[in-house]
Curated annotation (Swiss-Prot):
Catalytic EC class: oxidoreductase
Record flagged with keyword Membrane: no
One term of GO molecular function: glycerol-3-phosphate dehydrogenase (NAD+) activity
Gene: gpdh-2
Active site (catalytic residues): K248 (proton acceptor)
Family: Belongs to the NAD-dependent glycerol-3-phosphate dehydrogenase family.
EC number(s) from the headed UniProt entry: 1.1.1.8
Entry keyword set: Cytoplasm, NAD, Oxidoreductase
Protein name in the entry: Probable glycerol-3-phosphate dehydrogenase 2
Binding site for NAD(+): G42, S43, G44, N45, W46, G47, F130, K153, A196, R312, Q341
Annotated InterPro entries: 6-PGluconate_DH-like_C_sf, 6PGD_dom2, G3P_DH_NAD-dep, G3P_DH_NAD-dep_C, G3P_DH_NAD-dep_euk, G3P_DH_NAD-dep_N, NAD(P)-bd_dom_sf
Catalytic activity: sn-glycerol 3-phosphate + NAD(+) = dihydroxyacetone phosphate + NADH + H(+)
Length: 392
């Protein structure tokens, strides 16, 4: 290479660092940051489906991500074998996602702290009632610049009214807020019309990432999840994205009740519409300033429709009506050790609405809780819909 093409110092004998940066570019040829290490916290049906995606994308972007993806697994014995060993040896979650191969760079780790050690990105995908306990075990164990993203569809009810300005919200705390409050790190969210079995089958679908620091964190998170069949859109309205993901499970319970009662698609359509109306009002009341456009993302109307026709909450609530069994019995029979988040979210939503005197303004949400709690008969739901304030 001729001297005219190489930046040199005045004495032409050695290169200055600034000259090298000007020649090569500070962000391209010379790498200033090591690849990000990713940990998936959770290994259920949804967590394992997401692991298939993340395991693939991390290998596709070796400059951005470390190729090894650690997945925290709550150890179980399945057919006489440790689940973690089955995942690591046969690359299959035989309990929660049987028949689907996990990428060989996804490594099951049973120790929570060990699974997160040195990680730069934490993907939370566990039932929402376990988040607080998990985060408390990680306090002081992760760097302050760690990014987190929650795929958890639920909310936290703060009975003490302590923490993130929850008093004016009747104790409402988003899962992302709970993670951020405990771990002191930035938290984004991913929600959408994403039934786990279909995602695992690589069926085309969309998802929404809610990222308050869209310019700083959005591009990396999109690379982590975006594929040909899992299309990601990033928005800044993270609170709305997250609440849509939580509240749609409550509406899906109502849809399941109407299915169990033998009503048709017209009635279910009414449930979906009224549920959407209550969702938009709930978001605007507790988190003023939401963007209406967010409800038209995958996290909004699309997820609501999908869950009311195909989700586990609908399925469980239909069986609850038809069999007369308790919710716990139905979950045990139908969900293979997992739980429906709708009934618990409905209870938490009701408690915070009741505390702020708003339960009468959200009759569908209120009815779902009371039916799940045995305080109202499922057949009374239609009367609730018939007398909804939207019809007055």
């Amino acid at each position: 290479m001729s001297s005219s093409r190489i930046p040199q110092c005045e004495n032409s004998s050695r290169l200055s660092l600034s000259s090298i940066f000007r020649y090569f570019g500070t962000t391209s040829t010379i790498a200033t940051m090591s690849p990000k290490k990713v940990t998936i916290i959770g290994s259920g049906n949804w967590g394992s489906a997401i692991a298939r995606i993340v395991g693939s994308t991390t290998k596709s972007f070796p400059d951005e991500f470390d190729p090894t993806v650690r997945m925290w697994v709550f150890e179980e014995i399945v057919n006489g074998e440790k689940l973690s060993e089955v995942i690591n040896n046969r690359h299959e979650n035989i309990k929660y996602l049987p028949g689907k191969v996990l990428p060989n760079n996804v490594v099951a780790v049973t120790d929570l702290v060990e699974s997160c050690e040195g990680s730069n990105v934490l993907v939370f995908v566990v039932p929402h009632q376990f988040v607080k306990g998990i985060c408390e075990k990680l306090v002081g164990k992760i760097p302050a610049d760690t990014q987190a993203i929650s795929l958890i569809k639920g909310i936290s009810f703060d009975k003490t009214n302590q923490g993130v300005s929850t008093e004016k919200r009747g104790g409402l705390k988003l899962i992302s807020e709970e993670i951020k409050e405990i771990l002191k790190i930035e938290v984004s969210v991913l929600m959408g019309a994403n039934l786990a079995p279909e995602v695992a089958n690589d069926n085309f679908c969309e998802a929404t990432i809610g990222c308050k620091r869209k310019a700083e964190d959005g591009p990396l998170l999109k690379k982590l999840f975006h594929t040909d069949n899992f299309r990601i859109n990033v928005v800044e309205d993270a609170h709305t994205v997250e609440l849509c993901g939580a509240l749609k499970n409550v509406v899906a319970c109502a849809a399941g009740f109407t299915d169990g009662l033998g009503y048709g698609d017209n009635t279910k359509a009414a449930v979906i519409r009224l549920g959407l109306m209550e969702t938009t009002k709930f978001v605007e009341h507790y988190y003023p300033g939401s963007n209406l456009q967010t409800f038209f993302e995958s996290c909004g109307i699309a997820d609501l429709i999908t869950t009311c026709y195909g989700g586990r909450n609908r399925k469980v609530c239909e069986a609850f009506v038809k069999t007369g069994k308790s919710m716990a019995e139905v979950e045990k029979e139908l969900l293979n050790g997992q739980s429906a988040q709708g009934p618990l979210t409905a209870e938490e939503v009701y408690l915070m609405m009741h505390k702020t005197g708003l339960d009468a303004k959200f009759p569908l949400f209120t009815a779902v809780h009371k039916i799940c709690a045995g305080e109202m008969k499922p057949a009374e739901l239609v009367d609730c819909l018939r007398n909804h304030p939207e019809h007055m």
